[in-house]
């Protein structure tokens, strides 16, 4: 009511913008256009058109960075800095997360791309701080609901992997090098553009049950080894009805067919900038 009164007293205000909402305000008496923003996934307001803005992708990073560098250097810089401000300063981590959330994120950073269970995380965390399994569960759900992490489900078993929405956050949480899984997270971040749910199994890093396309992160695998791997995963691709398998690499490129399945080998920069 106070907001409505304020707007009635200040008729020069033509648009109301409310940022970083964590609750739904009373907007019934407001008669001007309204823009609301939130980082909470399940905060929905009836009568509003919804637009989801993700962290920037590689193409946007190139535009924002304005650095005249070779494309491979830009990929390396993107891997290092990440997709948002979280990749810039450690102080933002302390300001944005509770101690429990930080400990969970540190564990996820150390185990990026690995199969993870809440029980496993809880057993590890209770060695360092006083907490409960329910608290860990709620904290993980909050991190997922605020676009910090992304849970990738196995296509058949009750297994999951957890990645970062901004892979640059991993670099601020963990000093150990894990280029293979960081590149995997990088590939996944580009797939977010499709607004589809992805799954994994032991054959494919990510695949869509809707588009029937599978993706395999292979940053340093050479073409001969990729072709050997393609032969091994071919039966599973045919079983799942997948007729397009994409290997994302740092620089290798090729195309070939096996029993009607297209295997495409493409560098990350062309994969990302080709959307």
Name every feature range the model reports, one short phrase each.
Residues 20-24, 36-43, 203-205, 249-255:
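Short, polar loop motifs at secondary-structure junctions
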């Amino acid at each position: 009511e106070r907001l409505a009164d304020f707007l009635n007293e200040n008729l020069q205000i033509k648009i109301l913008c409310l940022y970083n909402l964590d609750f739904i305000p009373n907007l019934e008496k407001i008669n001007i256009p309204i823009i609301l923003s939130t980082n909470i996934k399940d905060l929905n307001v009836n009568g509003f058109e919804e637009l989801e803005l993700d962290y920037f992708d590689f193409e946007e990073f190139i535009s924002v960075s304005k650095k005249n560098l070779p494309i491979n250097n830009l990929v390396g810089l993107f891997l290092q800095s990440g997709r948002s401000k979280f990749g810039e300063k450690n102080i933002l981590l302390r300001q944005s997360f509770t101690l429990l959330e930080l400990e969970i994120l540190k564990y996820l950073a150390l185990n990026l791309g690995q199969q993870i269970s809440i029980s496993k995380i809880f057993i590890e965390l209770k060695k360092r701080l006083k907490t409960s399994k329910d608290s860990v569960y709620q904290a993980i759900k909050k991190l997922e609901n605020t676009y910090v992490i992304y849970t990738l489900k196995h296509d058949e078993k009750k297994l999951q992997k957890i990645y970062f929405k901004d892979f640059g956050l991993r670099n601020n949480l963990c000093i150990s090098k894990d280029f293979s899984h960081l590149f995997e997270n990088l590939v996944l971040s580009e797939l977010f553009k499709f607004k589809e749910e992805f799954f994994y199994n032991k054959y494919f890093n990510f695949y869509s049950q809707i588009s029937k396309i599978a993706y395999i992160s292979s940053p340093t695998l050479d073409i001969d080894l990729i072709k050997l791997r393609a032969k091994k995963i071919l039966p599973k691709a045919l079983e799942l009805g997948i007729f397009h398998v994409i290997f994302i690499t740092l620089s290798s490129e090729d195309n070939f067919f096996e029993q009607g399945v297209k295997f495409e080998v493409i560098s990350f920069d062309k994969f990302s900038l080709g959307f």
